[in-house]
Amino acid sequence: MLPSQSPAIFTVSRLNQTVRLLLEHEIGQVWISGEISNFTQPASGHWYFTLKDDNAQVRCAMFRNSNRRVTFRPQHGQQVLVRANITLYEPRGDYQIIVESMQPAGEGLLQQKYEQLKAKLQAEGLFDQQLKKPLPSPAHCVGVITSKTGAALHDILHVLKRRDPSLPVIIYPTAVQGDDAPGQIVRAIELANKRNECDVLIVGRGGGSLEDLWSFNDERVARAIFASRIPVVSAVGHETDVTIADFIADLRAPTPSAAAEMVSRNQQELLRQIQSVQQRLGMAMDYFLANRTRRLTLLHHRLQQQHPQLRLARQQTALERLQQRMNLAIDSQIKRTNKRQVRLLQRLNQQNPQPRIHRVQSRIQHLEHRLAEHVHSRLSAMRERFGNAVTHLEAVSPLSTLARGYSVTTVTDGKVLKKVKQVKTGDVMTTRLEDGWVKSEVKGITSAKRAQKKKPD
């Protein structure tokens, strides 16, 4: 009989550590799908939330260095798909998962892809309204790209038949759902452009979920619509369904039936318009004829008034009056000219310039004589004043003083030597004489004593 073995005894810490290691090493990394609840983000930047389904829930943590790579903001109730490691928080014994990556699940993922493609194409300018092509008015041939068995085609054909039965319609059948649908739609658009049979295209399908309409959110379809030379009207789903094709197309219709109305003419309305135009044209013609008749009568009357014989007679009378006025004007001008000529001759005789010229010449000679005397007198006076000034200037000139035996001595800085304190033994001085300069060196200095004045008693 084998001796009984005592059971292993764990401490709480060791138990939690053992469980954590088992979870982390045995299970490893897993993918989990669930719904987010209790989402929080404290100041640390980490995300804490609960991932649940109908029957269970688990606590989750996603640290900041991982969650900053997530391209969307998680919302309460959102279905997500996460890649995570299973672990145990040892201090409390709480089982939790550490999320490494997160992406929307199901339609959430499709919506994320939709927003990313929309932002990309918008940045490239494919949504620019200035690039939209105008629809022909009226359309002479309509091309329809949709499923040949779908309700959308039935609605389009029904509306076109009701509004404009004579309008040609060319159908380019294609799948509108499934993996092959985007490629078929692209080929149908390219085929319509290659054949160039239509002047407008309707591209669309009936309503459905986001996944059902996903072919019209495909980048290939969007670029094919943008590259189409033929204007494209998008007619995808219902009015609330908005796809990438709606943004790219030259015009968006809320439904396939609305698209058919946009590209077609209402024959009943056209008939009413034609009848209205005919009525207005008849009234305009009646008014035009009546107006022309009145003008013709007026012109006939004016023509009678403007008969050539009458016009010639009036012109002749006017010419005779003008000739008479011209003759009178010429005679009057000749008489005025003769009278003026006589007056000018009389004034000329009265204003003989010879005596006046003699008087002016005599006055000029007298003025010239007086001017010569005045100039001579002024010159004599100025010469006398100049001689006196020269004599006075020579009398006070330093050169005259030097000529009498005096001299002027300057020290090295060029100042005149006035006192013995300006020099010292060894200084060189310059003495100015009448006929030159003498440089000398100071050998000694002797101050002269001034005689002091006695104060009165």
UniProtKB/Swiss-Prot annotation:
**Of which family is this protein a member?**
Belongs to the XseA family.
Q: What is the protein's quaternary organization? A: Heterooligomer composed of large and small subunits.
Taxonomic lineage is:
Bacteria, Pseudomonadati, Pseudomonadota, Gammaproteobacteria, Enterobacterales
Q: Cite the Pfam families for this sequence.
A: Exonuc_VII_L (PF02601), tRNA_anti_2 (PF13742)
Q: Name one GO biological process term.
A: DNA catabolic process
Q: Which residues cross the membrane?
A: none
The reply to whether Hydrolase figures as a keyword in the UniProt entry is yes
Functional summary from the UniProt entry: Bidirectionally degrades single-stranded DNA into large acid-insoluble oligonucleotides, which are then degraded further into small acid-soluble oligonucleotides.
Asked if the Swiss-Prot or TrEMBL record annotates the protein with the keyword Nuclease, the reply is: yes
Gene name per UniProt: xseA
E.C. number, please? 3.1.11.6
Compartment(s): Cytoplasm
Q: Which CDD domains does the entry link to?
A: ExoVII_LU_OBF
Q: Which organism encodes this protein?
A: Escherichia coli O127:H6 (strain E2348/69 / EPEC)
Name listed for the protein in its UniProt record: Exodeoxyribonuclease 7 large subunit
Tell me which InterPro entries the record gives.
Exonuc_VII_L, Exonuc_VII_lsu_C, OB-fold_nuc-bd_dom
What intrachain disulfides are recorded?
A: none
| Catalyzed reaction equations | Exonucleolytic cleavage in either 5'- to 3'- or 3'- to 5'-direction to yield nucleoside 5'-phosphates
One of the record's GO cellular component terms? cytoplasm
Q: Which GO terms label this protein's molecular function in UniProt?
A: exodeoxyribonuclease VII activity; nucleic acid binding
Sorted alphabetically, the keyword list is: Cytoplasm, Exonuclease, Hydrolase, Nuclease
